[in-house]
């Protein structure tokens, strides 16, 4: 019995040495958009700090190219006073990446907004024109596929219901 116990302890030590340290598969998503303003001259007493919008979420890699992502969008609505905030589910999606191809399904980010935001790149100065003038929604219910041919050329296609993430269709038709 003692010999069996010693052999078991030795084999556990060997397994512990061979075990790889597993990297974290998930990551938190935290983005906060705010403004600070102050007046000059006659408007010098006009100062303010404002939290426009926050994104809180989590992304987890399941393995074999599969990942899931969920993001809450919290911000103010034009329908209520400035002190109230509303929360929406912006993303609830599953993705599969194989080589240079990516498939997304669920409540996904729309591809035209990703392209425009990367092109503009100065969200801290001003919203991009699609967001400013409400040319579509930044997320919607549907599927998308993207393929990267090279670093300088990609193609994508998206099929969505067109209602955005704030007005999810609840019934048929």
Predicted regions and their residues:
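Outer membrane beta-barrel
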Residues: 19-162
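A short hydrophobic/aromatic micro-motif that marks alpha-helical segments and, especially, helix-coil
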Residues: 12-15, 78-79, 165
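Surface-exposed beta-loop-beta
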Residues: 163-173
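Cleavable N-terminal export/targeting peptides
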Residues: 1-21
